Amino acid sequence: MIVKTNVKLNLGLSVLRKRADGFHDIETLFVPCYDFGDTLEIITGDDYSRTSAALFAKYGAPAGHFDASTISATDKLSDLQKALVGGPVEPTELSKSAKDEEKGADLPGNVAASYDGRLVQGISEDGKLMITIAREEGVDWDPLKDLCAKAYNILAQDFDLPPVKIFLEKEAPVGAGLGGGSADAAFTLKALNELCGLGLDDQRLSEYASKLGSDCAFFIFNRPMIGSGRGEVLEPYDINLSEYEIKVLIPEGVAVSTAEAYRGIVPREGLPSGRSDRLGEQKCLPEDPCASEC
């Protein structure tokens, strides 16, 4: 199964208060945005992948699977290739090549990466999940900790899932507040629900999604929603944006961690006395370019 994910926009964001669990209570309007998205393929272990050959060819590795001549972890890759074909395999540690040692790379066990870092592949310790992630700008995270892998694992806690292979090509900007990773997780949940015949409705899927990330549940419904709580409490909202052209500007090479962004916020309850926090009551500052229009 191959799906194209999308991202989301927040049309307004009000940070109300910091919670005891470390999250923030917010109010926001989520709307889907189809200008950006990733390509996700999920197949059972013995199915043929239409994505793998294209990914490996595009990112410099041979079609099919990794090869010792192009991959930093060398002598155990045949085990990765065999994984999921006949069911779970024994966990195996991947050794690092001399070139990789020179670069000081620190590969987790069971994870292989291309020399240029644009493609990584990992297999879970029980051998039931193989995940491959490709990104033009490089993949600097453990694929087994990606939200797609976490989506598989959270369903596997309650259901007897078959071994699967996940192929993900990251094209949506990372660290841009667009929810690309959350979308990948939500679409993984929906795909596994269909592939494995789990019979979960959107409400049940959203409950799983909310455990993976604050805005993951939105992508289960993928329509305009008012988000509250930490973003997982959703209420449908009718809005027609067809007459508007929304431009999304993303500075090249700039990525902001959501957690870091929230750490720098003073919630509404922390505003100085007398200060307005409503957008409609904001006044332009003298140095603001719009001051002459106010």
Model regions and ranges:
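ATP-binding N-lobe of GHMP and related small-molecule kinases
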Residues: 1-174, 194-199, 203, 251-254
